Amino acid sequence: MTGSFPQSRCRRNRLYPTIRQALMETVITPSNLVLPLFVVPGESVEEPVSSMPGVQRWSVDRLGKPVEEAMEAGVRCFLLFGIPSYKDPDGTSADRLDQPVQRALRLLRDRYPEAYLVGDVCLCEYTSHGHCGIIKEGNIDNDLTLKRLASVALSHAEAGAHAVAPSDMMDGRVSVIRQELDGSGFSDVGVWSYAAKFASAFYGPFRDAAESTPAFGDRRSHQLPVENRLEAIRDALMDQDEG
């Protein structure tokens, strides 16, 4: 009978390495990977992150070293996180063009035209309290924070980012950022939504690297509960609809 054993034998497509490779549904190569880079003020800085062995913070003038090593290995995409020269309650340094991420974007865009550059958009690295938004009466003001995030995203686009990646988990961030970029002539700049970002203890080492640990409280009011699968899917679909 056609379609049944013994005429149909699925193992025919598994017998030889060449055919197995040709029929792979999922192929992961260095070109599929994104390298995070933590950028700091100053010069000649190569500072190890103690909680993440092998990871360093770099000043802008030293970024060529990790970027060139990665590109030689086939990695072409880089996600930039910034540690600013100063912090305040509203994270006002986040959209300044003289800060590490914006400077790094300009340098890398000019020096490595084949690289794809993404700027992380959040306020936690830039606020003195370490939270992802502007605090009013003890809570994050979602809509006020959106205005700051849109300004940060625009500053990254102006500095040369191919895409921006809002990691704050505020409601409506993708829509507001998309509108800001499109209205400013950057419709080709992508928005990489973190979508399903959970309130997880696994972020501990990253917060050390980005110097973004909250000074009080936690981020459970905006990051997803780890128990809620359907909520994560809903958030991801909403981000997709927002652009």
Report residues per predicted region:
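Exposed beta-strand/loop interface patches that mediate assembly or binding
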Residues: 6-12
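Alpha/beta enzyme core
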Residues: 2-5, 16, 22, 28-35, ...
